[in-house]
């Protein structure tokens, strides 16, 4: 909604434009009227809509055509004033003033217009019969108000309707010629209906209607008011009420009725409560509230976020089998402009016979939050988190402390850990990721797939952690400055092909050797005969030289579910990186031996000194 309103008064000379402004401000009819009133600003606290309002007068005698065009360009709404006792001023509305305001607008939004029939004190009847054909011809005309500056009749109402035309415009909502909601409005209201339909029975119960009413307007409907609403719908819409519940058709009809009766602010209140702008698009503030993620920090869903997305899951799991079928998932995504999760989903999380279980669903949310928190905020926005939870979705996100602090303290508080699986093409990275999801080669899709992610939970010292595996090619890391940052690096080589180890060794030296990221070399295809290195150190010798854990053999051959031991090891290394270095540093063994020798020597010296003291005392 706009933060201020600029109203421009136009019309023929002597129709009373200036008198209307002065009567509003002075609350009495002015005895002397200047050719043009100065621009006035009405403070927000004295206007019904609580928005500051600027009122601008126009005088054809004092202002040029260029100044007029500039004022029209700046105006949010134009009041075309005519004299109800002068037919000629009414005709000028059609032939002069409306073409001046919107004549150059062939496409896009037009400036809303309020017709103002002044000097009603000089005419006994109404001018509406003459004005109605003009209102029918020009859809940008919001309404017509007859008033009298002399008698102060309808002066406040005039400027209220002008404000309303800006803050609650009819044009984006309703097509007066077709007498129906515009498609964008119907689409937005349909999404709101689906979010409010908590049991997904395609209708709003009294409880759901009251929750909706309270969310939008601050108070529930009285029982009789609820019955009256349903009665009106029943009389006008076939199928608008089903089993005493309001259907989507009934909901859309009610909003159409509000607009037709001039209460379009009601529909706008609903739309804005659910995040819509004047253009009937979800606002940036609604979809992406401010959240600061400093360098070295990561983002995770907190308990509020997990509770919300789990409620959404349970809402759409209509058969209560603990998993979302493709149809149920499509229902969940119906409030999005497009499905947010693509065909890569089955390769990213655990699924069950084409269905998405709660565990895999929560894993996917965790992955999106970690990799792209802006997308996560947007997804929560489309699901109505800010409205349904009455707080912006940044409250559902935890920003972790800097990784540097984790390294200093020797442990991490993070629940989500990132492992980059690095290796040359063909070493089995994709198979490794799928093995993490419990799929052996017998259950995997052998078609070529782009590098991706896999996420699952792993137990680390009795705590559940989310481990993300990210597939990275060695060529990319060696040829570019691609970000190699992660919590643990899994350097994978083909144990049957000695050449593939050289790629991993180069990546280690280039990116990880001088850093604090724990690394684990993995020898894939362990079911095949081990290759013999032609020259250079063997993988085991390389790891000993660089104080790294010994290479771990791995194979996912066969239909059985692969072992999870290696994934637990990776997660533990990521959670406690200092333990890796402490246990493997050769100096620690040397130091232990040295301390043993020194300890024995100190004990001998102390014993000898004690002996001398005892001898002297005798």
Swiss-Prot record:
Atypical mitochondrial nucleoside-triphosphatase (NTPase) involved in mitochondrial trafficking. Probably involved in control of anterograde transport of mitochondria and their subcellular distribution. Can hydrolyze GTP. Can hydrolyze ATP and UTP. The chain crosses the membrane at residues 593-615. The keyword Transmembrane applies. It comes from Homo sapiens (Human). GDP binds at residues 426, 428-431, 525, 527, 556. This is Mitochondrial Rho GTPase 2. Keywords: Calcium, GTP-binding, Hydrolase, Isopeptide bond, Magnesium, Membrane, Metal-binding, Mitochondrion, Mitochondrion outer membrane, Nucleotide-binding, Repeat, Transmembrane, Transmembrane helix, Ubl conjugation. SUPFAM superfamilies: EF-hand, P-loop containing nucleoside triphosphate hydrolases. Ca(2+) 2 binds at residues 317, 319, 321, 328. Residues 1-592 are cytoplasmic. It is found in: Mitochondrion outer membrane. Residues 184-219, 304-339 form the EF-hand domain.
